[in-house]
């Protein structure tokens, strides 16, 4: 797993976290317990810190850039090829495949940003809502069953990543 120091700051990855061997993590990054960073993902904290909580999955080919302090909470799923740029993502949120979340945006707890949605700079997404479109707009509230699926998904990624670790695929 390529971890690179930048300006004297080296990434800190919890020993139970999984980082794919071709993911790149640069600078002032912290990755929490049982989280996973999948193939082709780049996490770059060369301007501001990036903090990723526990049981969070950053799926394949994502870009996370700390243009401002970037905080991704616990039990978050960042979908394939999503871009997360200088923002805050609350616990249990989902950022859909190829979605973009711009600088200063705040995604509430258990909110879902739909696939391909674009959350504009400084936008605030309420907790337990689903947003979609370009620009992203609220389309509905999150159901209790959907909230449970998010928790199940985060747990499933944590379990899968441990299988990768057991097979020395990091």
In which residue ranges do the predicted regions lie?
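Left-handed beta-helix
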Residues: 15, 20-21, 26-27, 32-33, ...
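Active-site cofactor/substrate anionic-group-binding motifs, chiefly glycine-
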Residues: 50
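Solvent-exposed, flexible loop/coil residues
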Residues: 7-10, 17, 47, 68, ...
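C-terminal segments of enzyme domains that contribute to small-molecule binding surfaces
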Residues: 2-12, 72-78, 82-83, 100, ...
């Amino acid at each position: 797993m390529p971890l690179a120091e930048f300006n004297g700051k080296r990434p800190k990855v919890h020993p139970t976290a999984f980082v794919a061997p071709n993911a790149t993590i640069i600078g002032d990054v912290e990755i929490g317990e049982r989280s996973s960073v999948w193939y082709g993902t780049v996490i770059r904290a060369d301007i501001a810190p990036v903090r990723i909580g526990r049981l969070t999955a950053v799926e394949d080919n994502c870009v996370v850039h700390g243009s401002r302090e970037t905080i991704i909470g616990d039990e978050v799923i960042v979908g394939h090829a999503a871009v997360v740029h200088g923002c805050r993502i609350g616990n249990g949120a989902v950022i859909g495949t190829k979605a973009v979340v711009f600088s200063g945006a705040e995604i509430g707890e258990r909110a879902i940003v739909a696939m391909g949605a674009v959350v504009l700079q400084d936008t605030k997404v309420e907790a337990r809502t689903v947003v979609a479109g370009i620009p992203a707009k609220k389309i509905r509230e999150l159901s209790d069953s959907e909230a449970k699926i998010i928790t199940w998904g985060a747990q499933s990624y944590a379990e899968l990543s441990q299988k990768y670790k057991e097979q020395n695929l990091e």
